């Protein structure tokens, strides 16, 4: 297949178009934009250098402590919305569950490797939350609750995020077998495999490797 034929095929294939859109939309660096526009500061030069909510909080706290919490929450909402919107679009177009899960994964990859910031970005947690809420809402909401409880107890963002992710994945191995979940919100009924969710989990753990190292060395800062 020639290069031109490949391009034409891509432009005429709705799945391929959505894959590209998911990556590009997921790559919108809302945290970076908020801090850059409001305070003329590049959060990639501060703290963990991530563009996610935790580093937004850390960066803004040094400049305007009264706004730090609100901008951090806004960043979480916006980053989660990226994943939610692309999956919702796929659902409305009647795409297969396999495609929906692929789109969710690509939105997360886009956030972590933003094409607008030299393929650098955040840790992917908020975008993952938004991506899976429409696919596995029961486990997703339970994971959010776990995240909130662990955050309140330990007050360390990375611990709450990682345990929340583990909890969500673990529940997909349990809840579909003990609760009569509708086929449309059960990963087993959707695609008969946990593979995409496990890949998302592994990827989020990968982006948190520096945090995990700091946890073991006792150097991870409390933020929440």
Swiss-Prot record:
Enzyme class: transferase
Disulfide bonds: none
GO cellular component: plasma membrane
Subcellular location: Cell inner membrane
Membrane-topology annotation of the record: Multi-pass membrane protein
GO molecular function per UniProt: acyl-phosphate glycerol-3-phosphate acyltransferase activity
Keywords attached to this entry: Cell inner membrane, Cell membrane, Lipid biosynthesis, Lipid metabolism, Membrane, Phospholipid biosynthesis, Phospholipid metabolism, Transferase, Transmembrane, Transmembrane helix
Catalyses which reaction(s): an acyl phosphate + sn-glycerol 3-phosphate = a 1-acyl-sn-glycero-3-phosphate + phosphate
Entry function: Catalyzes the transfer of an acyl group from acyl-phosphate (acyl-PO(4)) to glycerol-3-phosphate (G3P) to form lysophosphatidic acid (LPA). This enzyme utilizes acyl-phosphate as fatty acyl donor, but not acyl-CoA or acyl-ACP.
Similarity section: Belongs to the PlsY family.
NCBIfam families given in the database record: glycerol-3-phosphate 1-O-acyltransferase PlsY
Protein name, entry field: Glycerol-3-phosphate acyltransferase
């Amino acid at each position: 297949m020639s290069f031109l034929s490949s391009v034409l095929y891509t432009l005429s294939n709705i799945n391929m178009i959505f894959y590209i859109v998911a990556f590009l939309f997921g790559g919108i660096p809302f945290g970076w934009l908020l801090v850059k526009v409001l305070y003329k500061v590049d959060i990639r030069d501060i703290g963990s250098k991530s563009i996610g909510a935790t580093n937004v909080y850390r960066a803004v706290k040094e400049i305007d402590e009264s706004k730090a919490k609100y901008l951090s929450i806004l960043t979480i909402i916006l980053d989660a919305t990226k994943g939610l919107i692309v999956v919702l679009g796929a659902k409305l177009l009647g795409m297969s569950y396999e495609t929906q899960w692929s789109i969710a994964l690509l939105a997360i990859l886009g956030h972590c490797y933003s094409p607008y910031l030299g393929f650098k970005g955040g840790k992917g947690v908020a975008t993952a939350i938004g991506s899976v809420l429409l696919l596995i809402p029961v486990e997703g909401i339970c994971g959010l609750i776990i995240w909130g409880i662990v955050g309140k107890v330990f007050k360390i963002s990375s611990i709450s995020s990682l345990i929340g992710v583990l909890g969500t994945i673990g529940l997909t191995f349990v809840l579909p077998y003990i609760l009569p979940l509708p086929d449309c919100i059960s990963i087993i009924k959707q695609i008969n495999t946990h593979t995409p969710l496990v890949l998302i989990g592994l990827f989020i753990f990968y982006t948190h490797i520096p945090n995990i190292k700091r946890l073991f060395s006792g150097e991870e800062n409390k933020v929440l």
